[in-house]
């Protein structure tokens, strides 16, 4: 964690001290962020050892501070909003309990390269060119959004928040095959909803986003997205009309279609499917199952 001045460190310390009260008084006791526990109060030592990692909690707290420019009141309000949204929306369930349409699962890919460049190790791929061929998948916005949030949560589980080179994720949106002239209204609605959720409830997690196989006249893709994100996020965007040039940015991505160094595996073979929740995330999910039964 890097603080540019004493004031930033003071804001961080103030927030860390206030988190237990914020969780108790403003979030109905809900204490989980991306599968991790922020507050050790009320736990036995055994539970602390199993479910609470102070280093991770500190770095998540720092991310919140950084996301909102160390403005204390803004940080607190957004933390409240994020935790309450997670309590109500249940993104862990999206990732690990719910069964999504198989066709959706085939166009959302996770890859992980331990030897990749800093913060380009965990990559979420969205193959929109394949998705738009099945417009019926976008007709139920809620189902699509829950699938997409589940993919995001699985991607986050591949990060190491204590590591300086793997505490952000990278995304690739592949638009090969998408019409350059029009976009179905259902697809637009789903995209708009997902973008809004990511911008509001997943701050300071994106390292870079690559839009690939985007025709020159395909300006609405970028125009749609940039309307709903801040300037800091927009600076992380890279638009490539030629998908085979992606390898210049993600060196170990598949050679097939993307020009990376991996000539043995295509994207399907690189896909990481065996993803598990954190210990604390698993505890929350098991608790929910018990409550549902009762």
From Swiss-Prot:
It comes from the Eukaryota. GO terms for biological process: Golgi to plasma membrane protein transport; phosphatidylinositol metabolic process; phospholipid transport; regulation of establishment of cell polarity; regulation of exocytosis. GO terms for molecular function: heme binding; metal ion binding; phosphatidylinositol transfer activity. Heme binds at residues 128, 148, 173, 175, 209. It is found in: Cytoplasm; Endoplasmic reticulum membrane; Microsome membrane. It is a peripheral membrane protein. It catalyses: a 1,2-diacyl-sn-glycero-3-phospho-(1D-myo-inositol)(in) = a 1,2-diacyl-sn-glycero-3-phospho-(1D-myo-inositol)(out). Belongs to the SFH5 family. This is Phosphatidylinositol transfer protein SFH5. It comes from Saccharomyces cerevisiae (strain ATCC 204508 / S288c). The lineage of its organism: Eukaryota, Fungi, Dikarya, Ascomycota, Saccharomycotina. The gene is SFH5.
């Amino acid at each position: 964690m890097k603080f540019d001045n004493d004031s930033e460190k003071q804001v961080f310390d103030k927030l860390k001290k206030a988190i237990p009260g914020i969780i108790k008084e403003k979030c109905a006791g809900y204490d989980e962020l991306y599968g991790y526990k922020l507050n050790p109060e009320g736990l036995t030592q055994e539970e602390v050892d199993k479910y609470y990692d102070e280093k991770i909690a500190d770095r998540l707290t720092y991310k919140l501070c950084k996301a909102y420019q160390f403005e204390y009141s803004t940080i607190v309000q957004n933390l409240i909003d994020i935790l309450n949204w997670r309590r109500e929306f249940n993104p862990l369930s999206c990732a690990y309990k719910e069964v999504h349409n198989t066709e959706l699962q085939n166009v959302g890919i996770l890859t992980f390269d331990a030897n990749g460049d800093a913060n380009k190790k965990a990559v979420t791929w969205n193959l929109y060119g394949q998705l738009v061929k099945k417009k019926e998948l976008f007709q139920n916005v809620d189902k699509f959004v829950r699938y997409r949030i589940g993919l995001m949560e699985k991607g986050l589980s591949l990060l190491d928040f204590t590591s300086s080179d793997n505490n952000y994720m990278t995304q690739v949106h592949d638009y090969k095959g998408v019409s350059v002239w029009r976009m179905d209204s259902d697809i637009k609605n789903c995209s708009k909803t997902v973008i809004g959720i990511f911008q509001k409830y997943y701050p300071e997690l994106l390292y870079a986003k690559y839009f690939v196989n985007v025709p020159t006249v395909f300006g609405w893709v970028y125009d749609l997205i940039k309307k709903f994100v801040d300037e800091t996020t927009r600076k992380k965007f890279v638009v490539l009309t030629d998908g085979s040039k992606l390898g210049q940015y993600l060196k170990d991505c598949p050679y097939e279609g993307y020009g990376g160094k991996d000539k043995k595996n295509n994207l399907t073979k690189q896909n990481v499917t065996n993803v598990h929740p954190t210990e604390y995330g698993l505890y929350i999910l098991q608790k929910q199952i018990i409550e549902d039964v009762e």
